[in-house]
Amino acid sequence: PVVEAHALDEGGGVAGIVGLGKAAELAVAEMEETTKKLTALRDKLIHGILESIPDSRLNGHPTDRLPGNCNISFSYIEGESLLLLLDALGIAASSGSACTSGSLDPSHVLMAIGLPHEIAHGSLRLTIDRENTEEQVDFILEKLPGLVQRLRDMSPVYPGKKA
């Protein structure tokens, strides 16, 4: 059967179009400042994690990435277990790439860039937006090393496991 399309309102939603235009104008005006803030927070987060957690690896290019994107893999842990511990602390994160969010399988994107299955399975994706603060990044950097070590201490394959 043929479906006829009808406008919701006469006039074509002018108010919505004007609102979208204003939102785009504001976004462009704030884009450079927002990008600088996100990049600084992202870089602090990445460097803090890599410096404080042995056997951690940045996934993707160190600078040619979205300003708020931090994707890191940790050897000898399961990403899903880390997500549960982070969630209990109020830290929102995901494992793998955005393409596989919600899946227990390792990210096909991480596998395609050459990560072994067990490393891709230990990945963590943290996304920073304009509402995040330096204090929140500091909180993650304070808590994450202990959580990763806790999971490694339970891992039967972790070579540094405490006897």
Regions found by a protein language model. Give the residues of each.
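Conserved C-terminal alpha-helix-loop-beta "cap" of PLP-dependent enzymes
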Residues: C70-R125
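Conserved PLP-dependent catalytic core of the aminotransferase class-I/II
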Residues: A29-L82
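Generic structural signal for well-ordered, non-membrane alpha-helical segments
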Residues: G13-I17, M31-R42, G79, G102, ...
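Predominant activation on well-ordered alpha-helical scaffold segments within soluble catalytic domains
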Residues: A15-E25, I46, L50, L83, ...
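PLP-dependent enzyme catalytic core of the Aspartate aminotransferase-like
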Residues: S101, D105-A163
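Glycine-rich beta-alpha junction loops
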Residues: A24, L45, F74-Y76, C99-T100, ...
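Conserved core segment of the aminotransferase class I/II
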Residues: P1-T35
